[in-house]
Amino acid sequence: MKKHVFFLLLLVFSFSASASAKAPQKAAAETVPADSLRVTIFGDSYSTFYGWLSPATNESWYFPAGHPGHVEGNDVTRVEETWWYQVIQQMGYKLEMNNSYSGSTVGYYGYQNQNYQPRSFNTRVANLGEPDLILSCCITNDSWTGETLGEYKYANWDENDMWYFRPAMARLCAALRLNYPNARVLFILNTDLKPEFCESMRIICKHYGFPLLELHDIDKQVGHPSIAGHRAIAEQVIDYLKK
């Protein structure tokens, strides 16, 4: 049954993708007062914190001090230290939900050749609430797992395409445009990723008319942003949103 639903959704996305790909994004978020603007965080481990994820079954990477899940060597122990919490607080936004999942990929190809479909961004994209703004830092694990780039493909996707980064990323953009036509979407590009993934992301975001914020100078501990790193991400995101 799930497979039939998947293909039905693909048909809908494929039908609308070509017509809407380069259409100007409706910027409803720009007219909503900041104190009532609803933000959804749609990310991977960089955007997690235990107890703040929806669904609650999503895996977290960041935990409070003293929790057995806390990773020694990374100094982030409070949700207030995360980049997304700082953005929401400083901008006066409201958190719609944080649907982030540690280790998640855009495509289905996971670490050690595992099937990451359950945690994939393409699987989770249908459950982002009713946001005015979506902030998504999303391709880090695709770059790290060894996932194949594949070809640029902007319509007529099939399930096999989801195992390749470029078509999977294109389908994600189409799904965001279709499901959240009135939301502003900002993709956030991590540092230290493979150049070919960064360039592919630039090309695909440009095709769909989605802005891409490229981070720089992000301090990391155990491969993840430290307190200083999260602060730097927050500052760069806030600077972009204020433009």
Task: Label every PLM stretch briefly.
Residues 38, 95, 184:
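Residues at the starts of beta-strands that form the adenosine-phosphate
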